[in-house]
């Protein structure tokens, strides 16, 4: 995707905020528990390479990604000796590519291990489906058979075993406890404990630090975002949001009563009013459902009017502004703040989706 460096729309990523979130989490972890930075999906929209560099500087001991291509991008960017785990499914025919690049893969099916032809040792993390219902083995018999298969092949190493909690971001813990118990049953069925046992995502690491095992997978909260609104007041420390989204007015005009804007003419002025066109649209991740949401102009709220277009959006101004005036979509302006959580609430979604939708057409600028 082409990045729009010559357009006045940009994202600012506060590296100091990422470092602070990591340091605060590390301070509450036992010394023998590693923190792995989850940088999948372009680091949740924050930029995979720069976030990985920042996380490593802050003390992260490795990285988790969703697909092999993300792991290879990290290797190509210079992360040659760092631990990298692919959390998602990898094609069997790509196992050798992962092995040659010293990338750890998730395995969750016995047949995936059959007839592998490897030119280098492959490190494997066994995924346990303890109740998430996506990927993973579900019985002790499966776990033991896979352990036996791996032990017979000197090119395979059972480096880790892990699971993922479905309700760690909820205050009610009964389902979480069921998952943990099932995982521990499968873990103890193995003849040999792998090097890495890991279960905790951001929510679990924040609320249930006792189940850190050997490593935690620090994702959404590394970026300063709360895993869910339900646990926002139960966090052990304040999270610092790292992402802000800005643009500038490229056209300012005054509407007369009866003038309409954007596709479908869904908004019509009822009085004389000032409006501005912004060079950002749904092709950038500002989806059409943002219509009616408010942005900040000189610290004042300004509503998005009419339909969000592919490349442009129109806002109603509180008064006349100059072309080139800055607009804050996510971030702080003159003491007022619009957060990713605010956008998520308006869109009836979660903060993860808000930042992940912001694609690479918007340039990222890294500060601090």
UniProtKB/Swiss-Prot annotation:
Post-translational modification N6-(pyridoxal phosphate)lysine, affected residues: 40
Domain of life according to the entry: Bacteria
MF-aspect GO terms: alanine racemase activity; pyridoxal phosphate binding
Gene Ontology cellular component terms for the protein in this record: cytosol
Pathway given in the UniProt record: Amino-acid biosynthesis; D-alanine biosynthesis; D-alanine from L-alanine: step 1/1
UniProt catalytic activity: L-alanine = D-alanine
Family of the protein in this entry: Belongs to the alanine racemase family.
Protein name: Alanine racemase
Organism: Listeria monocytogenes serotype 4b (strain CLIP80459)
